[in-house]
């Protein structure tokens, strides 16, 4: 196929097992881990875990990615849409609260096909970078119950420098508006597990508190309290972060508190992640 799925519109040739373009992946999904995951927000992980499938490859190129081994080095195992549907069944049998697809944009057609084969009875979570095209979101309409996008940057200069992502701000802003149109306001069951809605995540970068505060301004202006916002303090310099002096360290408590205070002042509903989460032990163990 000639691929223009993601906002990059590479016009690249992709076969089932190989591909050109930015992601350099074929059209068959490549996965690195399938298991209950307990590191998400409480309303996603709950007591039984989120049935998480980590996909290899990515449409971003974050220099600090903690999942660098799978996002950039593409380690993982190739599966078919049928095998992906079988993963949903196995996870559902483990009594997880939801099925959680992590970084699946570049495999969207295969993901849609897998849900035509088997649609779980539990909510579907789509965990993505926010750098998602309307084309992909239209494909997912009616399938996804909960969107879990990032909103990383307040300006495109930073997005290009650290994630190789042109027009990130405009793309993510439009994407989240479409997500909101599809799934609406947050809804919870009687156990306070999320059933519908959006949680927008923002990772605080060292030396960039201004970026974080401006991101929060963008979220407040565009979405108000129609979304939940998860403020993340788990940054660890991984991947190629050692080549960038300003981000080659963890965030300080002062940086974290400055952004958290601003988050609270703006009156967001959501979650704030403490600094002790910035530990390599929280990086998932891959199963190739």
List the predicted regions and their residue ranges.
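Auxiliary Fe-S-binding modules of radical SAM enzymes
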Residues: 1-19, 180, 184-288
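Non-cysteine beta-strand/loop elements that form the S-adenosyl-L-methionine
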Residues: 141-156, 226-235
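A cross-domain feature marking catalytic cores of carbohydrate-active enzymes
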Residues: 55, 103-105, 126-130, 151, ...
